[in-house]
């Protein structure tokens, strides 16, 4: 917002979804008014084009101070990282600020090639995200706890491998815990798990860092997710027809004890099917525990953010990442195409 005030004109470029050609359902026109409200009702003019004469004429005629242009992914040159596309899009402009951290893991034209044609900077959001994520990677001391949830170990295996040596405790809930329990020989009924990752889960638990992993000891279960009927059982009491849908009270108590004793918490992923009230207790209570903790709290992942929006207040958390897949890949130790390729913008 401060940089907008200093510019004669600014064009905002963005992408949305995975549209098939110019699918109107993915047009950015619907966000122009909302963007104007966020900018203290300063007029945001929408241009239904990505590049070309329509864009150049609007800028030349100075019809507005702020422009929002159409979805970049309406042109396959964006996803294919076409240099011709990048050259055409950037033609009317002098300066480029890349501030879409959520796309930094994609080798798209707007991420890696627009900057070749303009005086380019890394935006403040990207810089802030990197600062916060580096805190997670650089934290290698007592009192550092990680809480992971969600459905699949395959989505977070590299994350576990990279963070496990650094943490004091790594708690695992959600559907992904059942792959670990399967590896330990437990009956898990009809709960979701990934057969191809059972051996890897066993390897992690048998490693020299395996004693840092904390798994649930009790669960909320159902025989049919659609029934919204929940029973609470110990892990050793799983029956063949049970489906695990939430962590149980004993696990909630142990996870809460660890979190309350922590100095730094990184949370990614819900503890169960929190969208259904009967299965939401674990996620709801964990959200409250972290929000009230004295620890520095960092949260990543869309479902975790949805849980915060549903059960708590975003202001009670020190950092909520906008990155999604970009955050996970960075924390896995991967080099992201859009990170540190431009000099940081100083506002």
Segments predicted by a language model, with ranges:
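Divalent metal-coordination and catalytic microenvironments
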Residues: 15, 70, 99
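Short histidine/acidic/glycine/proline-rich micro-motifs that form metal-
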Residues: 17-20, 73-75, 272-273
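An acidic, phosphate/nucleotide-engaging active-site surface
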Residues: 34, 39, 43-92
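Single conserved hydrophobic/aromatic residue that forms the stacking wall/gate
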Residues: 1-12
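Divalent-metal (often Zn2+) His-rich catalytic cores of metallo-beta-lactamase-fold enzymes
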Residues: 16-17, 153
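Glycine-rich loop at the start of a catalytic domain that most often binds anionic cofactors/ligands
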Residues: 17-38
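Conserved catalytic alpha/beta core of Sir2/sirtuin-type deacylases, generalized to analogous enzyme cores
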Residues: 78, 82-347
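Short, conserved active-site loop motifs that form the nucleotide-linked donor/cofactor pocket
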Residues: 8, 44, 65-66, 211-213, ...
